Amino acid sequence: GMNEFFGGEISNHGIIVQGGLYNTLIRRLTNLGLADSFGNTRLPILVLNVTHPLVPDQISSFCAGKQSVLVMEEGNPEYLEQQIGQILRRADLQTKLHGKDVLPLAGEYTADVITQGLVDYLGQYDDAGIQGEALRDEAARLENVRANAQAALEEKVPPRPPGFCTGCPERPVFSAIKLLK
């Protein structure tokens, strides 16, 4: 089908992700020692290139036997997370669902946002294959990034003279007036 499955040996956890977030996710899993640069992942991933309609059998077979699954979807409300939760209940699967509990409700899921979500999600489970040290290193790095960003916000920004945007119809008139002065 249109959706892709990538298996991994850490079989009791997994990630269901919107297709557009896959590349950033795999890059961040690599940083955490959970994937390699060829896209081989140690954590099973179901990539939803088509998010509607969801295929219940596909979702339930991915989640079956897993202690937990993280649903990564941008935007609010969390349509996929709700639908997947419904599919799991109907299939009577006890897989714990994570999503907006560890990821922001709104805004773009940048690399650092995804990393923080992964750290918060995986940090709740200390079982085989998830390296606590890598998680702590990434958490510390993110804390450092936030501190540096905060410090940068407090610096004075050099003044910028007013001007018209490229493509503005008023721009040539303004330029002509400046030339006449």
What function would you assign to each model-found segment?
Residues 21-24, 28-35, 62-66, 83-87, ...:
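Generic, well-ordered alpha-helical scaffold segments in large soluble proteins
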Residues 38-140:
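Terminal amphipathic helices with adjacent charged low-complexity linkers/tails
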Residues 7-54, 91-96, 176, 180-181:
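Anionic-ligand anchoring segments at beta-strand to alpha-helix junctions in alpha/beta enzyme folds, i.e.
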